[in-house]
Structure formats: structure tokens, C-alpha cells
Amino acid sequence: ADGSWIPLSLPREMPDGFVCNCDEVAFNLVEKLKKAGYRIPQDIAVTGYDDHRFSTICTPQLTSYRVDVDGMANAAVNLLARKLNGKAVPAPITLVPGTIVYRESTQVK
């Protein structure tokens, strides 16, 4: 990444919540929403992905999906090894379970 950002713009009609592609984007979205007068999670829920440090420095702290990085790496290495050894490779999608880490940016109703 080169450190540049595509500016976030808020929609006219706000959804009940946002699911962001990473915690850094979720952090920036929370800041923008708060500046616009929204309360997180009372008005709008926000979740991130990757359970990065941004999830805990954000106020309120972000609910995030914790990725099993070791599991993803092991799955990739195993598929690559099978392919390099001429063995059959399963379907191109491999599911690696993760965990939802519930924090303050969402409300369980």
C-alpha cells in the first residue's frame, strides 16, 4: 500500500450497519460517522475484518472477524504441495474457519 486513501462518502439513506473489508477501513468509517453525528452502535453498527489493532484502538471498539492466518497459510501450502507433486487438487475454494470477536460497535438484539 502506498498510504493513499479513496475518500469515504456516506450514503444519503443510511443502512442499519456496515461490514467493512478490514478494521482500518472500519476505524476510518467510525470516525467519519461520529463526525457526522451518528452514534455507534445505537444508530449504526460497524464491523471490521481481520481483528487488527485498529479494532481495539477505535472508540467504540470494533466487532471484527478474526482470520485464522495460520490455517489459511497451511491450506495454501498443502494445495500448492499437492499440485507440485502432480496430485489432484480439490475444488478451488477452501473454507478456513474464523471467529467473530464481538465488541462495542455492534449490538446483539
Which role does the model predict for each range below?
Residues 1-4:
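Short beta-strand elements in bilobed, periplasmic/extracellular small-molecule ligand-binding domains
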Residues 7-109:
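Flexible loop/turn connectors
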